[in-house]
């Protein structure tokens, strides 16, 4: 342990010099609007009528939106809009969460239901759908598309009624109100809210995740924007052509039937709906490092710290929906918001049109996962294939297919697997670990008796520190050897059974080799030669 702490302190000092330069508040990216040539490739879509505050009440849009220093809709404008809709529609209920942001801002959300259901008493045999936006505060089409959906539902009562025959919907339009206020990606404390889903460093993350776990949705969406002007090619004169990038949850500990439902039904329909709206799309990607001259793009990964996968590990269909918007201020905002609205409407309509298949597949997947004795996946890899990706030449706005290497996660390939334990045993000295699991919606039983008997233990054979300081820690790659031993644990120890719906979140958090495990993030610090203090029951 001494070596770990010493290295951590050294890394803290070094990290202060190599980390991104952040201040308290207003960590805003530079604005680089599209040239007239590029802008011509993203024209307004004829017939667009968006029912959200930035478009129905343009006088409420702050001046800073035009130069990239503010979003288009202040908290009070958003709340007033939501309250008015709720007063006019009996099936819309306005709520304020019983928690606040790091700077004390409110979290308003809407609950949509044709019955008298609630989060605590959901409708029987209906889909539960969670929709969130505004996770990153400088991605305004995310929360605006959520507000546009609410306005669209209110303006189309027959469509709303058809949806609510089959589902109850919770809409949390603004996940990060402090970030929106400062028009920055991060929380007020400069943690990335979309990288905190396993380590749970911030109370705000825990509060929202507890609300999510209580609602226990079948379907969820996470609305974001991506950087518009990221350039590629030898001359840096090509950019992504897409209006929309999207991805389902990819972690291999999500039931395969649920993952296939996401890919084969929802993703295919979404692509068609985006094209039908006169927009362009591709799978969500990030740029990778490559030893070849060809551009390497990585499909959305499997890491559980990302909201898309963390939500999916509760065994539900999840989509990350991104629109083209970071760094261009108010440019093309109608088209951007429309892109988000088209994606979320596609998900809702697909679920209703295929209700029996969707509901039964997810419910069967939950039962199959809960009762499974299959091995769990600790690490995986992304096979690389050749394909093309839609690009735009910034010189003449030509649209073309650009050849790339593509690291695919549809599906990823398992590398390290381990037998699924019947349960985990956690000593009473680790109540903070149990609390984190409970935030995930994982149940833990406190034993009134001491446990004496055989367990599987993990002996740490290697700990490798990352080269970068990341959100308060130096992450580690841990290797272990599984051994059997007898143990005596005192009364008050915790038993975490794995025959429960959200157990996959326990797998990724408690198995040390996982990239986002508690051991990786130093929540449970270990050194080479240690025995990991969480035990497995066969």
Swiss-Prot record:
Q: Where in the cell is it found?
A: Secreted
Sugar attachment sites are 46, 393, 459
* Main location (coarse class): secreted
Instruction: List the CDD domains hit by this protein, alphabetically.
Output: M14-like
In residue numbers, the region (Disordered) covers 53-76
GO terms, molecular function: metallocarboxypeptidase activity; zinc ion binding
Q: What class of enzyme is it?
A: hydrolase
Entry EC no(s):
3.4.17.-
Keyword Protease included in the entry's annotation: yes
Q: Which cofactor does it need?
A: Zn(2+)
- Domain of life of the native organism: Eukaryota
Keyword line: Carboxypeptidase, Glycoprotein, Hydrolase, Protease, Secreted, Signal, Virulence
Q: Which residues bind Zn(2+)?
A: 136, 139, 224
**Is Chloroplast among the key words of this record?**
no
Q: Name one GO cellular component term.
A: extracellular region
Q: Where is the signal peptide?
A: 1-21
Check the record and name the InterPro entries matching this protein.
Peptidase_M14
Catalytic center residues = 322 (proton donor/acceptor)
Which GO terms fall under biological process for this protein?
Answer: proteolysis
Domain Peptidase M14 as annotated: residue spans: 71-351
**Role noted for this protein:** Extracellular metalloprotease that contributes to pathogenicity.
Q: Which family does it belong to?
A: Belongs to the peptidase M14 family.
Q: What is this protein called?
A: Carboxypeptidase 2
Q: Which organism is it from?
A: Trichophyton equinum (Horse ringworm fungus)
Encoding gene (name): MCPB
């Amino acid at each position: 342990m001494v070596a770990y702490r010493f290295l951590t302190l050294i890394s803290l000092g070094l990290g202060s010099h190599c980390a991104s330069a952040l201040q308290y508040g207003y960590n805003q990216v530079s604005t680089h609007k599209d040239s007239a040539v590029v802008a011509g490739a993203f024209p307004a879509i004829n017939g667009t009528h968006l029912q959200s505050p930035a478009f129905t009440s343009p006088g409420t849009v702050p001046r800073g939106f035009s130069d990239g220093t503010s979003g288009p809709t202040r908290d009070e404008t958003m709340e007033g809009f939501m309250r008015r809709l709720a007063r006019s529609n009996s099936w819309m209920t306005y709520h304020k969460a019983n928690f606040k942001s790091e700077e004390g801002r409110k979290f308003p959300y809407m609950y949509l239901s044709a019955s008298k259901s609630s989060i605590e008493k959901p409708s029987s045999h209906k889909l539960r759908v969670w929709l969130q936006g505004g996770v990153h505060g400088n991605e305004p089409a995310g929360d605006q598309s959520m507000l546009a959906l609410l306005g669209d539902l209110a303006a189309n009562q027959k469509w709303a009624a058809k949806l609510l025959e089959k589902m109850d919907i919770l809409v949390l339009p603004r996940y990060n109100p402090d970030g929106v206020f400062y028009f920055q990606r991060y929380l007020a404390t400069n943690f990335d809210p979309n990288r905190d889903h396993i380590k749970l460093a911030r109370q705000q993350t825990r509060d929202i995740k507890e609300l999510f776990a209580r609602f226990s949705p079948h379907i969820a969406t996470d609305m974001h924007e991506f950087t518009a002007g990221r350039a590629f090619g030898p001359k840096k004169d090509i950019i992504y052509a897409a209006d929309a990038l999207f991805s389902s949850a990819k972690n291999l500990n999500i039931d395969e039937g649920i993952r296939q439902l996401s890919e084969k039904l929802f993703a295919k329909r979404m692509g068609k709906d985006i094209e039908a709206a006169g927009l362009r799309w591709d799978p969500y990607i990030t740029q990778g490092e490559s030893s070849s001259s060809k551009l390497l793009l990585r499909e959305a990964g499997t890491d559980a710290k990302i909201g898309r996968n963390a939500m999916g590990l509760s065994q539900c269909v999840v989509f990350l929906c991104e629109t083209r918007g970071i760094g261009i201020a108010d440019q093309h905002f109608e088209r951007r918001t429309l892109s988000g609205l088209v994606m979320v409407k596609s998900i809702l309509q697909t679920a209703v049109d295929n209700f029996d298949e969707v509901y039964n597949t997810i419910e069967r997947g939950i039962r199959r996962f809960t009762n499974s004795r299959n091995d769990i996946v600790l690490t995986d890899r992304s096979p690389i294939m050749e394909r093309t990706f839609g690009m735009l030449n910034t010189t003449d706005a030509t649209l073309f297919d650009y050849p790339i290497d593509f690291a695919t996660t549809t599906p990823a390939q398992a590398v390290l697997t381990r037998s699924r334990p019947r349960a985990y045993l956690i000593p009473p000295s680790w109540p903070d670990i149990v609390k984190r699991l409970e935030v995930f919606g994982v149940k833990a039983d406190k034993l009134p008796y001491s446990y004496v008997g055989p367990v599987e233990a993990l002996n740490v054979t290697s700990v490798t520190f990352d080269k970068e300081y990341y959100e308060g820690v130096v992450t580690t790659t841990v290797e272990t050897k599984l051994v059997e031993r007898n143990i005596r644990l005192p009364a008050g120890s915790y038993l975490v059974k794995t025959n429960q719906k959200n157990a996959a979140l326990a797998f990724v958090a408690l198995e040390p080799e996982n990239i986002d495990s508690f051991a990786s993030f130093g929540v449970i610090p270990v050194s080479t030669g240690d025995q990991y203090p969480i035990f497995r029951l066969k």
